[in-house]
Amino acid sequence: MKIRYFITLVACLFCIATFAQKKNQTSETEFRAKQQTYMSQKAGLTQEESKQFFPLYFEFQDKKKEINKEAWEIAKQGKNPDTTEAEYEKIIDTFFDNQETIAKMEKEYIKKYREFLSNKKIYMVYWAERKFSRNMLKILQEMDDKEKK
């Protein structure tokens, strides 16, 4: 269940960043600045905590993005109608192996966060991240609905 939720969250974040950039020409820097401000406020991070947290957080996000990029490149092979069962097996195994790698890596980053943040603040940061993602999806959906009218 956790893996499914995690995969959904990662896919949403990746889509949000990509869609936001295309729709509004929002740069990754601008997107991250908005995300940082929102998460800092909602989690109640001090300026010092933010200075320590976000470089690590964005480092993790970049690594996660690269791992997911690899998984999606392999997954695209599945669109070919001539894909064999063995190739589908490789696609599935690679995807879930990558998710395991991300989960292990995230645990390592949480250890780093614990050096300067309480568990409560770590929880609050992750909660804020989820809320930010939902809010962005809602905004993007509203923009898409307006364009269709």
Each predicted region: which residue ranges?
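Bacterial Sec-dependent N-terminal signal peptides
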Residues: 1-26
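A periodicity- and composition-biased signal for non-globular, repetitive helical segments
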Residues: 8-10, 41, 70, 127
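A short hydrophobic/aromatic micro-motif that marks alpha-helical segments and, especially, helix-coil
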Residues: 17-19, 61-64, 133-136
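Short N-terminal segments immediately surrounding and downstream of signal-peptide cleavage
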Residues: 22-40
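Amphipathic alpha-helical segments
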Residues: 35, 39-116
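Amphipathic, charged alpha-helical segments and their helix-to-coil junctions
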Residues: 59, 103, 107-149
